[in-house]
């Protein structure tokens, strides 16, 4: 676990042209949101993994089930796997954002090293790319 820096000096937090500088309240609001999200995702992930284990245990190869029942169970299992993987990804992104806050690299685009933007981060605290780089990524 990395040591936290002094958060009273926020000069390390970049902003885009025309944006107000970060305040301690802004930073604490983002940190609080990320911590709450981490807690929620951790609980969701634990529940999803238990549900998935139950589905795997209940799926006995379909003996005695007709093909519609078997297909329904397979679909349900695949949906639960998708939800579980999505939760894992969101949790990893949330952890990464918290690490970047502690390392004082939060708010810097991981691609072009320009500011991600205060407004973007307040709307989507897990963002690691500025809007321009995110759009380029999505076009690929």
Label the predicted regions.
Residues 120-126:
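Short linker/helix segments within small regulatory modules
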Residues 88, 106, 127:
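Residues immediately within or flanking Cys/His clusters that coordinate Zn2+
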Residues 123, 138-139:
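Topology signature of small-to-medium multi-pass alpha-helical membrane proteins
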Residues 34, 112, 121:
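Residue-level signature of catalytic and energy-coupling elements of molecular machines
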Residues 116-117, 138:
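Short functional micro-motifs and their immediate structural scaffolds
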Residues 127-135:
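Cysteine-rich micro-motifs
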């Amino acid at each position: 676990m990395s040591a936290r820096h002094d958060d009273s000096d926020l000069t390390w937090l970049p902003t885009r042209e025309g944006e107000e500088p970060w305040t301690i309240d802004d930073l604490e609001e983002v940190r609080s949101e990320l911590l709450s999200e981490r807690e929620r995702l951790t609980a969701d992930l634990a529940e999803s993994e238990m549900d998935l284990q139950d589905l795997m245990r209940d799926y006995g190869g379909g003996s005695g089930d007709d093909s519609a029942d078997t297909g329904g169970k397979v679909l349900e299992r695949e949906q639960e796997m998708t939800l579980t993987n999505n939760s894992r990804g969101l949790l990893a992104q949330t952890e990464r954002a918290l690490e970047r806050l502690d390392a004082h690299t939060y708010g810097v685009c991981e691609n072009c090293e320009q500011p991600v933007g205060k407004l973007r981060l307040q709307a989507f605290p897990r963002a690691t790319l500025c809007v321009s780089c995110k759009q380029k990524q999505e076009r690929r």
